[in-house]
Regions:
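Single, function-defining residue in the core of a domain
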Residues: 1-237
Length: 237
C-alpha cells in the first residue's frame, strides 16, 4: 500500500502520521526516532529500523539501569560492529520500557572526521559550541531496531538502513523531474491540489517505467525456432 499525508510547513515528521500493519518495516532517519512512535509501530505488529543520536532516547539495560553508550562504543575497533539488547525508557523514571536492539558501527577515521566537521559547521551556524559527546558520536552509526537477531543480523540491519538512501533519491528525482519544489499557487488548497496531482503523475510514471523495464528490449517478438532458416555461409572468394 501507498500512504501519503501532505502537511503544511508547521507539521513535523512523525511515524504517528501513518497506520502500520503486521509485516510492515519502517526505515527512518534521526527525525523519526521518538520513543512513543516507535512503540506504536511495534504494538501494531510492524518493525522498525531507525537511526538515532547519542541523546535522542533514554536507553536502559533490561534491568532498568542507564545504558552506557560510550563505554560500548569505546570497545569498537575501526569499522567494527556490535549490538546490544536494550530497552527504551518511556517515562522519566524509566519504569515503563520497550525492548529494542541497538546496532553500532564505527566509521573509518576519514568518514568520522567528515562527520565531525559537519557537526562543527552546524554548531557555528547556530551560534553554539559543539558538544564533546556529539563529536565523539559522529564517528559511529547508531541504529535502533525491533528486529531480533534471529530475523536480521547486525550486518543485515545496517544493509536495510542503507536502502533508505534510495527513498531520498526518489524525492530528489521528483523535485528535479516534476519541478515539485516550485509551487505556482499561494492558496493552501490550490497548492495542496497541485502537489497531489504531481504525486499522482509520479506514481503513474513509476508504473510505466516498471512495466517497460520488465519488457524484453526488442521491438519484434522472436519467432519460434521452427520458423528460423539457417542459410549456409557463402564460401570465401
Amino acid at each position: 500500500t501507498t500512504a501519503v499525508e501532505l502537511s503544511d510547513g508547521r507539521g513535523a515528521e512523525s511515524l504517528s502520521r501513518f497506520a502500520w500493519e503486521r509485516g510492515d518495516l519502517v526505515l527512518g532517519d534521526r527525525g523519526y526516532a521518538k520513543a512513543n512512535d516507535l512503540v506504536a509501530v511495534a504494538d501494531a505488529g510492524a518493525d522498525y529500523v531507525v537511526r538515532i543520536g547519542w541523546n535522542a532516547l533514554k536507553l536502559r539495560t533490561h534491568d532498568g539501569l542507564p545504558f552506557d553508550l560510550f563505554a560500548a562504543l569505546d570497545r569498537l575497533p575501526e569499522q567494527g560492529m556490535a549490538e546490544a539488547e536494550i530497552s527504551i525508557a518511556l517515562d522519566r523514571a524509566g519504569t515503563r520500557r520497550s525492548p529494542a536492539r541497538l546496532v553500532m558501527l564505527r566509521k573509518t577515521e576519514t568518514d568520522a572526521e567528515a562527520s565531525r566537521c559537519k557537526a562543527r559547521r552546524k554548531s557555528r551556524r547556530q551560534g553554539k559550541t559543539v558538544n564533546a559527546n556529539t563529536l565523539k558520536a559522529a564517528g559511529y552509526v547508531l541504529l535502533l531496531t525491533s528486529l531480533d537477531a534471529n530475523r536480521a543480523a547486525a550486518a543485515d540491519v545496517l544493509a536495510l538502513y542503507r536502502v533508505r538512501w534510495q527513498i531520498e533519491l526518489v524525492f530528489k528525482r521528483l523535485k528535479s523531474l516534476l519541478d515539485l519544489a516550485a509551487l505556482p499557487a499561494k492558496d493552501p488548497d490550490l497548492a495542496r491540489s497541485w502537489i497531489y496531482a504531481k504525486l499522482i503523475v509520479a506514481l503513474l510514471l513509476e508504473n510505466v517505467c516498471h512495466d517497460a523495464l520488465d519488457s524484453p528490449p526488442c521491438a519484434e517478438p522472436i519467432p519460434p525456432a521452427d520458423d528460423l532458416s539457417m542459410a549456409p555461409a557463402s564460401p570465401a572468394a
